[in-house]
Amino acid sequence: MEINTELIKKLKKLSNIELSPSEEERIKKDLNALLEYQKILDKIDVEGIEEMVSPIEFSTSILRKDEVESFESRKKIINNFPENKDGFLAVPGIHVNEEE
């Protein structure tokens, strides 16, 4: 796969961002460099190597236990948001039209 100008323009539209022509070129160059690096990584033989979740071994959990906490300003935040529905923030959906 190669990142070309057409793909950058499509990503720009999906991301709803504006880029100058020089920024488009820089991003195209950077993404292609990442893909080339991925090709190098793909060639590494990992047969027989055990998968790991983290490179650090944890003998005990360092994560705290989840605890439900009440949040006093929740209603204020929801009421100040431009659009809300059933007590939740409402945001525009992301729909991809393949024809565009």
From Swiss-Prot:
Q: What class of enzyme is it?
A: ligase
Keywords recorded for this protein, A-Z: ATP-binding, Ligase, Nucleotide-binding, Protein biosynthesis
Q: For this entry, list what GO says about its biological process.
A: glutaminyl-tRNAGln biosynthesis via transamidation; regulation of translational fidelity; translation
Does ATP-binding count among this protein's keywords?
A: yes
Quaternary arrangement and interactors, per the entry?
Heterotrimer of A, B and C subunits.
What family is reported?
Answer: Belongs to the GatC family.
Please state what the protein is called: Aspartyl/glutamyl-tRNA(Asn/Gln) amidotransferase subunit C
Which organism is the protein's source?
A: Petrotoga mobilis (strain DSM 10674 / SJ95)
